[in-house]
Regions:
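Bacterial N-terminal signal peptides that target proteins for export
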Residues: 1-6
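Surface-exposed, glycine/proline- and aromatic-rich loop segments on solvent-exposed faces
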Residues: 92-117
Length: 220
């Protein structure tokens, strides 16, 4: 079982000697939506993530949306499916099922949750917000090499930062979400690829959503 350390479930230490490497749009997408990231995971196992949310515009949503997200497997009609469940206080809510062969759907859940949260908090069209976020996922970026402590050992990581509304003409009307940063940290040594997926508005002062790898349970 692997558990990340520190209060936020993981600690990323950027390696100062290694500069950020530029990626074109396709390379950014391929790193974020990497294929085959579930292939080595036993179909009897469960990947468990922790979602922590703070929202100063709608404080009540923080408690509502904070909890565990579990990824388990089930056999579909034509293929194995990865099922996502929100778990809190002994209650389970299915979030969706996705073909396991494609990769880890946690990133899709992450950005859809951010789109929903932003639309609910700041107003505006969720379709407009989603389109800006999706565009950010295929833009050129820089990947930051680093390390993280996982289960008491140091592992190599890569982090991509995205700012969907940096040049948006409406950003000043977004109640702090105009400064939204999406930050995805991945590692070959973390089951399921994603170590953390973080969204921060106004540096976290307005809104923060962190989805962090917690553990691999050998059985569901």
């Amino acid at each position: 079982m692997i558990r990340t350390l520190a209060a936020a479930a993981f600690t990323v230490l950027l390696a100062g000697a290694a500069p950020a490497a530029p990626l074109d749009g396709q390379q950014t997408y391929d790193l974020l939506f990497r294929n085959g990231t579930l292939d080595a995971i036993s179909r009897d196992a469960a990947l468990v993530y922790r979602r922590d949310v703070t929202n100063t515009i709608k404080p009540e949503t923080g408690d509502r949306d904070t909890g565990a997200i579990a990824l388990t497997f089930r056999e579909g009609q034509d293929a194995t499916l990865a099922k996502l469940e929100f778990r809190k206080d002994g209650k389970y809510r299915v979030l969706g099922s996705f073909p396991a062969s494609v990769g880890n759907p946690m990133i899709m859940y992450f950005y859809e949750a951010v789109v929903r949260d932003m639309a609910e908090s700041a107003g505006g069209s969720p379709f407009y917000i989603r389109n800006r976020v999706k565009e950010a996922l295929i833009q050129p970026s820089e990947v930051e090499p680093g390390t993280a402590m996982v289960d008491g050992r140091s592992v190599e990581t890569r982090t991509i930062r995205m700012h969907p509304f940096a040049d948006d003409p409406n950003r000043d009307r977004m109640q702090g979400f105009g400064d939204l940063e999406l930050r995805v940290t991945v590692s070959e040594e973390v089951p399921g690829w994603y170590l953390s997926l973080v969204a921060e508005a106004d540096g976290g002062a307005v809104y923060r959503s962190e989805l962090a790898f917690d553990r691999l349970d050998p059985s569901q």
